[in-house]
Amino acid sequence: MTDEQTPAEEMPFEADDAAQEIEALKLEVAQLKEQALRYAAEAENTKRRAEREMNDARAYAIQKFARDLLGAADNLGRATAHSPKDSTDPAVKNFIIGVEMTEKELQSAFERNGLKKIDPAKGDKFDPHLHQAVTEQPSTEVAAGGVLMVMQAGYELMGRLVRPAMVAVAAKGSTGPASPDAPAASANPYAGAAAEGDSTGGAFDAKA
């Protein structure tokens, strides 16, 4: 500082330097905030991804185990359906009760672990995502595209299909009443007049 310069004359330069430093610090703070938010988002995404992978691994393990048990569930269901319920033999009656209780307990265990049975009722709309049509037959009781009978129940685990329900479907030209949620004729692959030679029905494979 020369003799002619005074402290008051230097103050504008010092104020400018301070203002620039403040702006630089503000910019650095903003960058750090943005970086912190980005790291937090990445951490949350990593957490969600880990949880999803863990749930998928758990669901896969249960699905594989459940698939191994479906055969036993099918056999118990068939045994219950074809058991002589009008039998007067106490031993037979007790055996039937035991089979029914075993099937009920197995289905309860399935439900507790997220395994849901797919067992459409007669007349329900065919759903290609949940059902597999193994045959189609003309019907006067069910409208075209409706389920006539379930040949084998299906199962889904936490929204993921384990096995589609094997069903017989009412063929084109069937005259039964339509279910309330039946698709429009233009969207129903079974609707409309039966084609010549289709009266006996044919195999239809619609794997989910």
Curated annotation (Swiss-Prot):
GO terms for biological process: protein folding. GO terms for molecular function: adenyl-nucleotide exchange factor activity; protein homodimerization activity; protein-folding chaperone binding; unfolded protein binding. The keyword Cytoplasm applies. It is found in: Cytoplasm. The keyword Chaperone applies. Coiled coil: none annotated. Residues 172-208 are annotated as: Disordered. Participates actively in the response to hyperosmotic and heat shock by preventing the aggregation of stress-denatured proteins, in association with DnaK and GrpE. It is the nucleotide exchange factor for DnaK and may function as a thermosensor. Unfolded proteins bind initially to DnaJ; upon interaction with the DnaJ-bound protein, DnaK hydrolyzes its bound ATP, resulting in the formation of a stable complex. GrpE releases ADP from DnaK; ATP binding to DnaK triggers the release of the substrate protein, thus completing the reaction cycle. Homodimer. This is Protein GrpE.
